[in-house]
From Swiss-Prot:
Function: Regulatory subunit of the poly(A)-nuclease (PAN) deadenylation complex, one of two cytoplasmic mRNA deadenylases involved in mRNA turnover. PAN specifically shortens poly(A) tails of RNA and the activity is stimulated by poly(A)-binding protein pab1. PAN deadenylation is followed by rapid degradation of the shortened mRNA tails by the CCR4-NOT complex. Deadenylated mRNAs are then degraded by two alternative mechanisms, namely exosome-mediated 3'-5' exonucleolytic degradation, or deadenylation-dependent mRNA decaping and subsequent 5'-3' exonucleolytic degradation by xrn1.
Domain writeup: The N-terminal zinc finger binds to poly(A) RNA.
Molecular function as annotated in GO: ATP binding; poly(A) binding; protein kinase activity; zinc ion binding
Protein name per the record: PAN2-PAN3 deadenylation complex subunit PAN3
Region (Pseudokinase domain): 256-516
Subunit structure: Homodimer. Forms a heterotrimer with a catalytic subunit pan2 to form the poly(A)-nuclease (PAN) deadenylation complex. Interacts (via PAM-2 motif) with poly(A)-binding protein pab1 (via PABC domain), conferring substrate specificity of the enzyme complex.
Keyword Ribonucleoprotein: no
Region ranges (Disordered): 1-21, 45-128
Zinc finger residue extent: C3H1-type: 19-48
Organism (species): Aspergillus terreus (strain NIH 2624 / FGSC A1156)
Gene: pan3
Region of interest: Knob domain: 556-653
PROSITE patterns membership: PROTEIN_KINASE_DOM, ZF_C3H1
Lineage start: Eukaryota, Fungi, Dikarya, Ascomycota, Pezizomycotina
Polar residues: compositionally biased ranges: 108-119
Amino acid sequence: MASDSRRGTGSPKMKGRENAKDTLCRNVTIYGRCRYEDKGCVYNHDPNKTNSAYQSDSKRRLNVDSPSFTPSLLSSNGSSPTSSSATLKKTTTISPKAANAAPFQPRGISSRSNASTPSARAESAAPDWSVAEVQEFVPQGFETSHMASLQGNGNGPVPSTSPFDPFVTTSNPLAAANAVGPVQANPFSPDTAAAALGGATFFTGQTGFQPVQYHLYAPIGPHSQNTLGYQRNVHDLFLPNDFREELQKKAAATLQTLPNTQLPAQVDYFHSLVPLDLNHQKNATIFGFPSWVYKAQSSKDGNFYALRRLEGFRLTNEKAIRSVQAWKRVCNGSVVTVHDAFTSRSFQDSSLIFVTDYHPLSKTLAEQHLSAGNRFQGRSNTHIPEQVLWGYMTQIANALKAIHSNGLAAKIIDPSKILLTGRNRIRLNACAIMDVVQFDTQRSIADLQHQDLVSFGQLIVTLGANSPSVMHNPTKAMEHFTRAYSPQMKNSVFWLLNSMQKDQDHTIDIFITGISSQLMSTFDSALHMDDQLTSDLSRELENGRLVRLMTKLNFINERPEYEHDRQWSENGERYFLKIFRDYVFHQVDAHGDPVVDLGHVLACLNKLDAGSDEKITLVSRDEQSCFIVSYKEIKKALESSFQALLKPTRRVH
């Protein structure tokens, strides 16, 4: 009994398959033949026989005359496996209504039982199939919101939308987040529509952007709108040539000296005098005294100033020269700033010196538009456009506004005393001189300010007629001015010329109100000019940084005084700094000719300053040593070597 019980609980013997002769042997499928075919293998070894048997069986099973499938009822869940097999009732007959029964279609799948449910209960559960509940497998359409974040600490979900585009924003972010995404086709479906997509399903469009390169120049606006995205010109990379030449010429004019001159070596605290007058003939028309203009350098601050000298002036009242103190408070962009005034005998006479700002390469309006000082006297002057003339009027009005607000009067508004310091940029000059020269003249400030307005109108008429003597015939001058310019310009000039009338109130504030529209135009032009200068300045912003890098490299490389110093050896990090210098500046082409490439130098220095992870190959001059280092390592070596250079003087061992 014991042996029988042990035999009953042993592993059951594997039963042979009844349809083994119709099953194709796996060895034939895998290896092409079965080595056990003649040694008792019971499976089929003829693939053709298997296919024919399968086709015949399919024809028999898919016959339209065959009855529909009617599953038998299983036992209840509570019955045991033995009792259920005993009481299982098999249907051996077919109902007459089976001919009209609908074909079998799966309806749904039942919910799976828990892991703790017995296997018999799971087998007895009635399956309920539903195709609609089974989701198709779509690789590109999976929901990424349920996945952990691939970046950061994993707390946030991966966004299911497309990559962020800074140039395309949604008007309603909440609506965009809740919106249903587009339905993608199933690439594994045999549908012809999905097949027509080809490879487009697997290779969707990518709209990612590269990160900002902080070691490159930042393109600050304004930007040119008439070029395409891939087009570049020289002005996009460097300072405009005309602007650069203008600045260089002004710098050269500022530093200009005149050796072997008969001018005094020093006038008070100024030295290095250079005459600025184009006409060497004495002219006392404006001030009543011959005047000369010099450029000089101050011994106090080292800056350059313009000195206007009134020859032969004798100061009789000390209060007269103190009136210049009021002009020091006038700080306006359209007025040349007055810094000081003093008398001097450095020119072997009694002279009055006025110290003002120096604007290199500046011209007067008379030299620019009235042929004053021009060697081609017979050449006719060009007509001044109305917009340029409006610009002059707004700037002079700005200057008079500042002067009159301080209780002063310009007294001199003459084309020969108005400086053109830039393109259509003018400044009133020599304003404080008449306050000293005519100090004893008794005249009210209101009358002097009205006279400024009249002189203002005469200046505009003179510039519009392109002739300095046009005011000798005012009627003819106004006829020409009326034909050449708009009615608004004509009315403004008429208003200025009639400022001396007592029956009307004429102030510079009323005049500014009348030309407010032109003031806005000039202000807009000034804003555009400011944007342009800011853009040009941004291109030169990094030049100092690159110069510092080159300076550090030259400080470190090839120092002969430390050649035998053990602490300053070029075998370590300083050695590939030396080779890096050759890599940047001493490259040659395939023919051995030097490569002069400014772009290569700028790119290398920018990457060095940023500490990029990009690696480069450095080869020694004898081609016996080779280093593969990154810009980050080179930057670290550069900083450590430079800091070591700044340490106290070391002793040579």
